[in-house]
Amino acid sequence: MVEAGTRDPLESALLDSRYLVQAKIASGGTSTVYRGLDVRLDRPVALKVMDSRYAGDEQFLTRFRLEARAVARLNNRALVAVYDQGKDGRHPFLVMELIEGGTLRELLIERGPMPPHAVVAVLRPVLGGLAAAHRAGLVHRDVKPENILISDDGDVKLADFGLVRAVAAASITSTGVILGTAAYLSPEQVRDGNADPRSDVYSVGVLVYELLTGHTPFTGDSALSIAYQRLDADVPRASAVIDGVPPQFDELVACATARNPADRYADAIAMGADLEAIAEELALPEFRVPAPRNSAQHRSAALYRSRITQQGQLGAKPVHHPTRQLTRQPGDCSEPASGSEPEHEPITGQFAGIAIEEFIWARQHARRMVLVWVSVVLAITGLVASAAWTIGSNLSGLL
C-alpha cells in the first residue's frame, strides 16, 4: 500500500452520518485505509474505503456484504474485528478495529530476518486466527505480511478476510485475472483460481520462509512470472540461505508448500499443532513481537494530532473543508423528475447539522471545560476538608 503525502479529499467527511474520516493511513489498488472515529460510540476505528468503481457493481456489493457479515461473526483475538459495512455515495466501506501499531511488512523492512523464536511468536496468532476461520468454512486467500498487523501492545492480528473473494465477484474484474499477491499464491490459485484451507497453508509456508530469510522464495521480472514459477518448482530450504535455521523449520515449510494440496497440512489447525511441537522440541523462548517504529499508522496518528493541536492553538473554530467542488453551473442541470432519487447519496461533512470539524472542536472544548470545573471542585473540597480538620483539632485541644 502507498502512504498518503497530501490531504485526501475524503478527510473530514462523515460516512453514513456516523464515521468521521480523520486521516489517511495508506492506499492500494482497490482501496484506501483511514483512521476514523465512530461519532455515535466515540470509538476509534479503521475505515477501509473501496475504490468508487465498485459502487455500482451489484455483484461486488452483494459479496462484500456477505463476506463482511461472515467475518464479523468470528470471535478471535487474532483477527481484526469487523464492526460494520456500508456505502456512502460512491464509496463502499468497511469499518474495522483500529490497530495502533503497524504491519509485519514494515517490521521486516526495519529489522530484517527473524530468529526461530520470533517466527513462532508471529505464526502462533496467525495460525490461530486462520484456524478459527477454517473451522467456520472461511478461506483468507491473501495471507501476506501487509495483512498481518502488530499492535503497540505486541498483539499480532490477521486482517482483510474475504476482500479477494469480493473483488473476484465484481463484474468489472476481468476473467482469467490472477487475484491475490503473486509471491504468496498457492499453485492451485495460479492455475485455476480455486482456494481452500490448504491454499492458506501454502501462503503461510511462504511467509515462514520469508520471515527466516528476509525474502520470498521466487523472484521474477513480473508478478505473472513469479506466480507461475511455483507450478514447477518447490520452495527451497531456508537453511540453504541462512545458516543456523533448524531443520524442523525446513520440514515445516516443505510440508506447508507442497505443490500437491493433498501433501500439505489439511488446514491451519494441523499446521499450528506441528508448530507447537517444534517450539517445544527446540525449547524456544517466549517472545513479544515489537510493532514497527516508523509505520504508516503511527505517522497518520501523529499527523492528525498535529492538525488538532494547530487548530487549538489558533483559538478559533476550524474552517470546514468541503469534500466536493462545484464543477458546473446550477443551470447546467435539469431538475430531477418528481419522486426520483439521486444515483448516489452524497457524503455529508456534517453531524446533526453542524460542520464536522466544528463538532470536533466543540467536543474537545467541552472536555477541557469539564476538566477545569473538576479541578476547581476538587480544590474547594480540599480547602473545606483542611479547614474542618484544623477546627476539629483546635476543639479537641480546648476540651
From Swiss-Prot:
It comes from the Bacteria. Its main location: membrane. Signal peptide: none annotated. InterPro entries: Kinase-like_dom_sf, Prot_kinase_dom, Ser/Thr_kinase_AS. The active site is at 142 (proton acceptor). Residues 312-346 are annotated as: Disordered. It is found in: Cell membrane. The chain crosses the membrane at residues 369-389. Autophosphorylated. Thr-173 is required for autophosphorylation and transphosphorylation activities. Thr-175 is not necessary for autophosphorylation activity, but is required for full kinase activity. Changing residue 173 to A: Strong decrease in autophosphorylation activity. Lack of transphosphorylation activity. Phosphorylates the DNA-binding protein Rv2175c. May be involved in the regulation of cell division and cell envelope biosynthesis. PANTHER family: MITOGEN-ACTIVATED PROTEIN KINASE KINASE KINASE 20-RELATED, SERINE_THREONINE-PROTEIN KINASE YBDM-RELATED. This is Serine/threonine-protein kinase PknL. It comes from Mycobacterium tuberculosis (strain ATCC 25618 / H37Rv).
